[in-house]
Amino acid sequence: MTLQLNGEMLTINDIKTFLNKEDTVEVTQEALERVKKSRQTVEHIIENKETIYGITTGFGLFSDVRIDKDEYNQLQVNLIRSHACGVGKPFSEEVALVMMVLRLNTLLKGHSGTTVALVEQLVYYINNRIVPVIPQQGSLGASGDLAPLSHLALALIGEGNVFFKGEEVDSRYVLNQLNRNPIQLQAKEGLALINGTQAMTAQGVINYIEAEALGYQAEWIAALTHQALNGITDAYNEKVHKARNFQEQIDVAARMLDWLDGSELTTTQGDIRVQDAYTLRCIPQIHGASFQVFNYVKEKLEFEMNAANDNPLIFDEGDETLVISGGNFHGQPIAFALDFLKLGVSELANVSERRLERLVNPQLNNGLPAFLSPQPGLQSGAMIMQYAAASLVSENKTLAHPASVDSIPSSANQEDHVSMGTIASRHGYHIIENARRVLAIETIIALQAVEYKDIDKLSPKTYEKYQELRHIVPSITEDRQFHKDIEAVSQYLQDLAYM
């Protein structure tokens, strides 16, 4: 399939499908016409020797330095080379690929003044999966993600490394193999490639996809735990949740009842106890709040995916054309959103760890063996899995500290406030990985716990999950290296996010 790009209507679901099916991209004719018209403005500026930031001047503190006309193109190449100061491990291939798609989509709005040739080069790289190797660290999140996007731009001009067919290789080598020339950057184009928030937004899109999936997965995992503990279903009654009327809470309660429908292990209030602990009783309230966060983040990401965040921006007003220096590259809206996402995911892990603690604690688990050990004393069972979960949620509490409240001035105080949004995105993904492992641990323990209660009494939907997962992780009949089980179930959960 082909993903049509026009700068206006790209969605997270489009990106998810694009990644899952290895689609190609195609630019609409209408968008190309906007690009051409925008470029005409840049050519007019050059012809008339106007003073416009980043086209005929230097950058940052050097914005008052006028550049000679015969050096306009070299200025753009120098910009890319000097700004490619990223360090550390690279972004995943998926994030870097999404970064290219998002930057292309921004250019198609027709406010950036690039050539059609640059657009075509981006399309070629995306469709042939020539993916720039982009270090994760080094961005302040304003003026956009300068360092990461400079590494992206390097690949387009045949410098730097790329991922290609499963290997990291020199970009010039790949271009030679494909008989493709590197792009020759024209005036304004280097700046148009790197002034934006595509690194934080691309990682943010991946974060959202996997976080939302974790939210849904946490429900059937919690449903297994609920049955192992003979939980009370009255708390999920629709009347309770409509009385508060948060839609996400109502939806989680309905889905929990759906997962539990037909179970012979659940109870009603008064059967065994009058009410459950909060980690069971308040699943709709807790998980629902995380979905509120996810919905907020999705809205902000999709705004930014279709936004013009270059500088300066070109506006064709019919009778006149305006070139305006602004600050749409500032990542604060996305930085806030991605910090918020960290909280929503962290709480899914926090409540999961408390649920799995109830499963292994003989004082709380309604008659199950201590730590679900097949031979208590001789075999430790799930004891240290709870330790691991506790460690992961504690680590998340430090990672959840908001990056967006920090700022360090740069460029001799010309760029005196920055967003740190890319740090928020990176820390957010670490939180998601940790949370996924916590939920994997709850899954393993809940699967074992329901075996003590009789798996034939599970609800039909959770019984299907039980059978599916037993092909991945066997029953605990004796102590073994549980880290392998945790990683296997975690990978299973991650794979589900893209199905």
Swiss-Prot record:
Subcellular location, principal: cytoplasm
Lineage: Bacteria, Bacillati, Bacillota, Bacilli, Bacillales
Alphabetized SUPFAM superfamilies for the sequence: L-aspartase-like (SSF48557)
Cross-link (5-imidazolinone (Ala-Gly)): 142-144
Keywords: Cytoplasm, Histidine metabolism, Lyase
Gene Ontology molecular-function annotations: histidine ammonia-lyase activity
2,3-didehydroalanine (Ser) carried by residues: 143
Record-listed E.C. numbers: 4.3.1.3
Cell compartment(s), UniProt: Cytoplasm
UniProt gene name: hutH
Protein's UniProt name: Histidine ammonia-lyase
PANTHER family reported for this sequence: HISTIDINE AMMONIA-LYASE (PTHR10362)
Pathway: Amino-acid degradation; L-histidine degradation into L-glutamate; N-formimidoyl-L-glutamate from L-histidine: step 1/3
Family: Belongs to the PAL/histidase family.
InterPro entries to which the protein is assigned, alphabetical: Aromatic_Lyase (IPR001106), Fumarase/histidase_N (IPR024083), HutH (IPR005921), L-Aspartase-like (IPR008948), Phe/His_NH3-lyase_AS (IPR022313)
GO cellular component, one term: cytoplasm
Modification after translation, per record: Contains an active site 4-methylidene-imidazol-5-one (MIO), which is formed autocatalytically by cyclization and dehydration of residues Ala-Ser-Gly.
